[in-house]
Amino acid sequence: LLAFLMVLLALVTILGNVLVILAFIMDREISDRSNYYFLNLAISDFAVGAFCMPLYIPYALTGTWHLGRGLCKLWLVMDYLLCTASVFSIVLISYDRFLSVTKAVSYRAQQGITSNPVINMVAIWVLAFLLYCPAILFWEHVAGCSMVAVDQCHTEFFYNWYFLLCASTLEFFVPLLSVTYFNVHIFHSIQRHQRQGSVQDCDPQKNSRLSWRFCLLPRPGASSPPSEAEDSVSSLTRSWRPEATANCPSPTQTSPTALKRDISVSFRSSTGSKLQQDKRRAKSLAIIVCVFAICWAPYTLLMIIRGACRGKCIHNSLYEITFWLLWINSALNPFLYPVCH
Protein backbone atom coordinates (compact mmCIF):
# COMPACT_ATOMS: atom_id res chain seq x y z
CA LEU A 1 0.00 0.00 0.00
CA LEU A 2 2.81 2.40 0.87
CA ALA A 3 4.56 1.70 -2.43
CA PHE A 4 1.30 2.29 -4.31
CA LEU A 5 0.78 5.66 -2.61
CA MET A 6 4.34 6.73 -3.42
CA VAL A 7 3.99 5.76 -7.08
CA LEU A 8 0.58 7.46 -7.26
CA LEU A 9 2.04 10.67 -5.84
CA ALA A 10 4.83 10.60 -8.43
CA LEU A 11 2.34 10.09 -11.27
CA VAL A 12 0.07 12.90 -10.06
CA THR A 13 3.06 15.23 -9.80
CA ILE A 14 4.25 14.37 -13.31
CA LEU A 15 0.86 14.55 -15.05
CA GLY A 16 -0.30 17.68 -13.26
CA ASN A 17 2.81 19.67 -14.11
CA VAL A 18 2.94 18.32 -17.68
CA LEU A 19 -0.55 19.72 -18.25
CA VAL A 20 0.57 23.12 -16.95
CA ILE A 21 3.62 23.13 -19.23
CA LEU A 22 1.56 22.07 -22.27
CA ALA A 23 -1.06 24.72 -21.54
CA PHE A 24 1.64 27.39 -21.50
CA ILE A 25 3.13 26.15 -24.79
CA MET A 26 -0.17 25.76 -26.67
CA ASP A 27 -2.15 28.74 -25.36
CA ARG A 28 -0.27 31.93 -26.23
CA GLU A 29 -2.84 34.05 -24.39
CA ILE A 30 -1.44 32.94 -21.03
CA SER A 31 2.19 33.46 -22.05
CA ASP A 32 2.56 36.76 -20.24
CA ARG A 33 5.25 37.84 -17.82
CA SER A 34 3.70 36.51 -14.60
CA ASN A 35 2.90 33.12 -16.12
CA TYR A 36 6.56 32.58 -17.01
CA TYR A 37 7.18 32.25 -13.29
CA PHE A 38 4.39 29.68 -12.95
CA LEU A 39 6.00 27.80 -15.83
CA ASN A 40 9.32 27.87 -13.99
CA LEU A 41 7.66 26.43 -10.89
CA ALA A 42 5.92 23.74 -12.96
CA ILE A 43 9.22 22.68 -14.56
CA SER A 44 10.94 22.23 -11.21
CA ASP A 45 7.94 20.36 -9.76
CA PHE A 46 7.76 18.12 -12.83
CA ALA A 47 11.42 17.18 -12.46
CA VAL A 48 10.80 16.31 -8.81
CA GLY A 49 8.10 13.84 -9.85
CA ALA A 50 9.97 12.47 -12.86
CA PHE A 51 13.44 12.06 -11.34
CA CYS A 52 13.61 12.48 -7.56
CA MET A 53 10.60 10.44 -6.48
CA PRO A 54 11.20 7.32 -8.65
CA LEU A 55 14.80 6.97 -7.48
CA TYR A 56 13.91 7.47 -3.83
CA ILE A 57 10.96 5.04 -3.63
CA PRO A 58 13.10 1.82 -3.54
CA TYR A 59 15.44 3.44 -1.00
CA ALA A 60 12.52 4.49 1.21
CA LEU A 61 10.97 1.00 1.12
CA THR A 62 14.15 -1.04 1.69
CA GLY A 63 16.33 1.39 3.64
CA THR A 64 19.28 0.55 1.38
CA TRP A 65 20.70 2.48 -1.58
CA HIS A 66 21.56 0.10 -4.44
CA LEU A 67 22.36 2.58 -7.22
CA GLY A 68 25.95 3.50 -6.36
CA ARG A 69 27.70 6.57 -5.00
CA GLY A 70 27.72 8.52 -8.27
CA LEU A 71 23.98 8.30 -8.83
CA CYS A 72 23.46 9.10 -5.16
CA LYS A 73 25.36 12.36 -5.59
CA LEU A 74 23.37 13.19 -8.71
CA TRP A 75 20.09 12.47 -6.95
CA LEU A 76 21.04 14.65 -3.98
CA VAL A 77 22.09 17.54 -6.24
CA MET A 78 18.87 17.35 -8.25
CA ASP A 79 16.63 16.99 -5.21
CA TYR A 80 18.05 19.96 -3.33
CA LEU A 81 18.32 22.04 -6.50
CA LEU A 82 14.74 21.41 -7.65
CA CYS A 83 13.12 21.88 -4.25
CA THR A 84 15.04 25.10 -3.61
CA ALA A 85 14.20 26.41 -7.09
CA SER A 86 10.54 25.66 -6.39
CA VAL A 87 10.67 27.75 -3.21
CA PHE A 88 12.43 30.65 -4.93
CA SER A 89 9.86 30.52 -7.75
CA ILE A 90 7.06 31.04 -5.23
CA VAL A 91 8.94 34.08 -3.90
CA LEU A 92 9.31 35.44 -7.43
CA ILE A 93 5.61 34.90 -8.17
CA SER A 94 4.71 36.79 -4.99
CA TYR A 95 7.09 39.62 -5.89
CA ASP A 96 5.64 39.83 -9.40
CA ARG A 97 2.10 40.08 -8.01
CA PHE A 98 3.34 42.70 -5.55
CA LEU A 99 4.66 44.85 -8.40
CA SER A 100 1.52 44.39 -10.51
CA VAL A 101 -0.65 45.78 -7.70
CA THR A 102 1.55 48.41 -6.05
CA LYS A 103 3.39 49.67 -9.16
CA ALA A 104 0.82 48.96 -11.85
CA VAL A 105 1.91 51.61 -14.37
CA SER A 106 5.59 50.65 -14.56
CA TYR A 107 4.64 46.96 -14.40
CA ARG A 108 2.38 47.20 -17.46
CA ALA A 109 5.04 49.17 -19.32
CA GLN A 110 7.40 46.19 -18.99
CA GLN A 111 4.76 43.54 -19.64
CA GLY A 112 5.96 42.75 -23.16
CA ILE A 113 9.66 42.53 -22.27
CA THR A 114 10.32 38.79 -22.05
CA SER A 115 14.01 39.19 -21.21
CA ASN A 116 13.21 40.35 -17.66
CA PRO A 117 11.40 37.18 -16.50
CA VAL A 118 13.98 34.99 -18.25
CA ILE A 119 16.81 36.72 -16.39
CA ASN A 120 14.94 36.34 -13.10
CA MET A 121 14.34 32.64 -13.72
CA VAL A 122 18.00 32.00 -14.57
CA ALA A 123 18.98 33.83 -11.38
CA ILE A 124 16.68 31.55 -9.39
CA TRP A 125 18.36 28.40 -10.67
CA VAL A 126 21.85 29.80 -10.11
CA LEU A 127 21.06 30.78 -6.51
CA ALA A 128 19.37 27.44 -5.85
CA PHE A 129 22.45 25.60 -7.13
CA LEU A 130 24.88 27.67 -5.08
CA LEU A 131 22.96 27.17 -1.84
CA TYR A 132 23.41 23.39 -1.46
CA CYS A 133 25.10 21.80 -4.45
CA PRO A 134 28.75 22.83 -3.80
CA ALA A 135 28.45 21.42 -0.27
CA ILE A 136 26.95 18.18 -1.60
CA LEU A 137 29.72 17.73 -4.16
CA PHE A 138 32.79 18.85 -2.21
CA TRP A 139 32.07 18.43 1.52
CA GLU A 140 33.82 15.07 1.85
CA HIS A 141 36.85 16.35 -0.07
CA VAL A 142 37.22 19.34 2.25
CA ALA A 143 36.66 17.19 5.35
CA GLY A 144 39.07 14.52 4.09
CA CYS A 145 36.67 11.59 4.52
CA SER A 146 33.05 10.57 4.01
CA MET A 147 30.65 10.14 6.92
CA VAL A 148 28.00 8.37 4.81
CA ALA A 149 27.82 4.55 4.73
CA VAL A 150 28.17 2.81 1.39
CA ASP A 151 24.57 1.55 1.38
CA GLN A 152 23.10 4.91 2.43
CA CYS A 153 22.38 8.08 0.48
CA HIS A 154 22.26 11.38 2.32
CA THR A 155 24.36 14.50 2.46
CA GLU A 156 27.62 14.81 4.39
CA PHE A 157 26.18 17.77 6.30
CA PHE A 158 23.16 15.73 7.37
CA TYR A 159 24.08 16.15 11.05
CA ASN A 160 25.86 19.50 10.85
CA TRP A 161 23.55 21.75 12.82
CA TYR A 162 25.27 25.03 11.95
CA PHE A 163 25.20 24.51 8.20
CA LEU A 164 21.60 23.28 8.26
CA LEU A 165 20.48 26.33 10.24
CA CYS A 166 22.17 28.76 7.85
CA ALA A 167 20.95 26.96 4.72
CA SER A 168 17.40 26.59 6.07
CA THR A 169 17.30 30.29 6.86
CA LEU A 170 18.04 31.11 3.23
CA GLU A 171 15.88 28.33 1.81
CA PHE A 172 12.77 28.64 3.99
CA PHE A 173 12.68 31.36 6.63
CA VAL A 174 13.77 34.28 4.42
CA PRO A 175 11.43 33.22 1.56
CA LEU A 176 8.55 32.76 4.01
CA LEU A 177 9.06 36.23 5.50
CA SER A 178 9.40 37.70 1.99
CA VAL A 179 6.18 36.22 0.61
CA THR A 180 4.35 37.18 3.81
CA TYR A 181 5.54 40.77 3.42
CA PHE A 182 4.52 40.87 -0.26
CA ASN A 183 1.08 39.42 0.40
CA VAL A 184 0.33 41.75 3.31
CA HIS A 185 1.24 44.78 1.20
CA ILE A 186 -0.84 43.45 -1.72
CA PHE A 187 -3.95 43.21 0.46
CA HIS A 188 -3.31 46.65 2.01
CA SER A 189 -2.90 48.18 -1.45
CA ILE A 190 -6.12 46.60 -2.72
CA GLN A 191 -8.06 47.80 0.33
CA ARG A 192 -6.67 51.33 -0.12
CA HIS A 193 -7.71 51.37 -3.78
CA GLN A 194 -11.18 50.15 -2.82
CA ARG A 195 -11.58 52.96 -0.29
CA GLN A 196 -10.40 55.54 -2.82
CA GLY A 197 -12.84 54.16 -5.40
CA SER A 198 -15.70 54.44 -2.92
CA VAL A 199 -14.86 58.07 -2.16
CA GLN A 200 -14.72 58.95 -5.87
CA ASP A 201 -18.06 57.27 -6.53
CA CYS A 202 -19.70 59.30 -3.75
CA ASP A 203 -18.19 62.65 -4.85
CA PRO A 204 -18.51 63.09 -8.63
CA GLN A 205 -17.03 66.61 -8.41
CA LYS A 206 -13.62 65.07 -7.60
CA ASN A 207 -13.41 62.83 -10.64
CA SER A 208 -10.22 62.79 -12.61
CA ARG A 209 -9.69 65.61 -15.12
CA LEU A 210 -10.47 64.44 -18.63
CA SER A 211 -8.93 65.70 -21.85
CA TRP A 212 -11.41 66.41 -24.66
CA ARG A 213 -10.58 66.40 -28.35
CA PHE A 214 -12.70 68.51 -30.71
CA CYS A 215 -12.48 70.26 -34.05
CA LEU A 216 -13.93 73.51 -35.35
CA LEU A 217 -15.45 73.04 -38.78
CA PRO A 218 -16.62 76.11 -40.78
CA ARG A 219 -20.19 76.08 -41.99
CA PRO A 220 -20.62 75.99 -45.77
CA GLY A 221 -20.78 79.48 -47.19
CA ALA A 222 -19.95 81.20 -43.94
CA SER A 223 -16.83 82.18 -42.05
CA SER A 224 -16.23 83.40 -38.54
CA PRO A 225 -14.07 86.38 -37.77
CA PRO A 226 -10.78 85.44 -36.16
CA SER A 227 -11.65 87.15 -32.92
CA GLU A 228 -14.94 85.25 -32.66
CA ALA A 229 -13.24 81.90 -33.27
CA GLU A 230 -10.58 82.68 -30.69
CA ASP A 231 -13.24 83.62 -28.14
CA SER A 232 -15.00 80.29 -28.79
CA VAL A 233 -11.80 78.32 -28.31
CA SER A 234 -10.94 80.25 -25.17
CA SER A 235 -14.39 79.65 -23.71
CA LEU A 236 -14.25 75.92 -24.42
CA THR A 237 -10.76 75.69 -23.00
CA ARG A 238 -11.81 77.26 -19.72
CA SER A 239 -14.83 75.00 -19.29
CA TRP A 240 -13.67 71.64 -20.69
CA ARG A 241 -9.85 71.87 -21.04
CA PRO A 242 -9.98 70.47 -24.59
CA GLU A 243 -7.16 69.50 -26.92
CA ALA A 244 -7.69 71.04 -30.35
CA THR A 245 -7.01 68.80 -33.31
CA ALA A 246 -7.32 68.98 -37.05
CA ASN A 247 -8.76 66.62 -39.64
CA CYS A 248 -11.41 65.31 -37.25
CA PRO A 249 -14.44 63.39 -38.42
CA SER A 250 -17.81 65.06 -38.61
CA PRO A 251 -19.03 66.12 -35.17
CA THR A 252 -21.81 64.13 -33.60
CA GLN A 253 -24.82 65.38 -31.72
CA THR A 254 -23.68 63.75 -28.44
CA SER A 255 -24.01 66.07 -25.47
CA PRO A 256 -20.66 66.83 -23.78
CA THR A 257 -22.29 66.21 -20.39
CA ALA A 258 -23.56 62.80 -21.50
CA LEU A 259 -20.19 61.95 -23.03
CA LYS A 260 -18.40 62.88 -19.83
CA ARG A 261 -20.80 60.74 -17.82
CA ASP A 262 -20.33 57.74 -20.14
CA ILE A 263 -16.53 57.96 -19.98
CA SER A 264 -16.63 58.34 -16.20
CA VAL A 265 -18.83 55.26 -15.84
CA SER A 266 -16.61 53.30 -18.24
CA PHE A 267 -13.47 54.35 -16.33
CA ARG A 268 -14.92 53.30 -12.97
CA SER A 269 -16.12 50.00 -14.46
CA SER A 270 -12.65 49.25 -15.86
CA THR A 271 -10.97 50.20 -12.59
CA GLY A 272 -13.40 48.07 -10.60
CA SER A 273 -12.82 45.09 -12.88
CA LYS A 274 -9.04 45.41 -12.47
CA LEU A 275 -9.47 45.70 -8.70
CA GLN A 276 -11.60 42.55 -8.54
CA GLN A 277 -9.05 40.68 -10.64
CA ASP A 278 -6.21 41.78 -8.35
CA LYS A 279 -8.26 40.79 -5.32
CA ARG A 280 -8.98 37.33 -6.71
CA ARG A 281 -5.35 36.74 -7.64
CA ALA A 282 -4.18 37.95 -4.24
CA LYS A 283 -6.42 35.45 -2.47
CA SER A 284 -5.27 32.60 -4.69
CA LEU A 285 -1.62 33.56 -4.17
CA ALA A 286 -2.22 33.54 -0.42
CA ILE A 287 -3.48 29.94 -0.76
CA ILE A 288 -0.30 28.90 -2.59
CA VAL A 289 1.85 30.55 0.07
CA CYS A 290 -0.09 28.90 2.92
CA VAL A 291 0.25 25.47 1.29
CA PHE A 292 3.98 26.12 0.87
CA ALA A 293 4.36 27.04 4.55
CA ILE A 294 2.38 24.01 5.74
CA CYS A 295 4.37 21.60 3.58
CA TRP A 296 7.82 23.03 4.30
CA ALA A 297 7.73 24.14 7.95
CA PRO A 298 7.65 20.64 9.57
CA TYR A 299 10.57 19.33 7.50
CA THR A 300 12.70 22.43 8.03
CA LEU A 301 12.23 22.45 11.80
CA LEU A 302 12.78 18.71 12.17
CA MET A 303 15.88 18.85 9.97
CA ILE A 304 17.47 21.46 12.23
CA ILE A 305 16.50 19.60 15.41
CA ARG A 306 17.69 16.29 13.96
CA GLY A 307 21.02 17.84 13.04
CA ALA A 308 21.46 19.28 16.53
CA CYS A 309 20.86 15.96 18.29
CA ARG A 310 22.50 13.90 15.51
CA GLY A 311 19.29 12.00 14.77
CA LYS A 312 18.79 10.66 18.30
CA CYS A 313 15.78 12.78 19.27
CA ILE A 314 13.70 12.48 16.08
CA HIS A 315 12.28 9.14 14.96
CA ASN A 316 13.20 8.29 11.38
CA SER A 317 9.58 7.60 10.35
CA LEU A 318 8.54 11.09 11.47
CA TYR A 319 11.37 12.60 9.46
CA GLU A 320 10.32 10.55 6.40
CA ILE A 321 6.76 11.85 6.64
CA THR A 322 7.91 15.46 6.65
CA PHE A 323 10.30 14.70 3.79
CA TRP A 324 7.47 13.40 1.60
CA LEU A 325 5.41 16.42 2.61
CA LEU A 326 7.85 18.54 0.59
CA TRP A 327 7.09 16.52 -2.51
CA ILE A 328 3.35 16.66 -1.84
CA ASN A 329 3.72 20.41 -2.29
CA SER A 330 5.04 19.80 -5.81
CA ALA A 331 2.00 17.62 -6.52
CA LEU A 332 -0.47 20.21 -5.19
CA ASN A 333 0.91 23.26 -7.01
CA PRO A 334 -0.56 22.40 -10.46
CA PHE A 335 -4.05 22.22 -8.96
CA LEU A 336 -3.59 25.65 -7.38
CA TYR A 337 -2.58 27.40 -10.64
CA PRO A 338 -6.12 27.65 -12.13
CA VAL A 339 -7.36 29.71 -9.17
CA CYS A 340 -4.73 32.32 -10.03
CA HIS A 341 -6.29 33.08 -13.43
PLM feature spans:
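Hydrophobic residues within alpha-helical transmembrane segments
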Residues: 4, 8-11, 40-43, 47, ...
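Loop architecture of class A 7-transmembrane GPCRs
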Residues: 60, 64-81, 103, 109-184, ...
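Seventh transmembrane helix
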Residues: 174, 178-182, 283, 289-304, ...
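Intrinsically disordered, low-complexity cytoplasmic regulatory segments of eukaryotic proteins
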Residues: 185-273
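Residue-level signal for the membrane-embedded core of alpha-helical transmembrane segments
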Residues: 12, 82-89, 177-181, 285
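Extracellular N-terminal segment of 7TM GPCRs
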Residues: 1-15, 19, 272
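Extracellular TM2-ECL1-early TM3 structural module of rhodopsin-like
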Residues: 1-7, 23, 29-117, 157-160
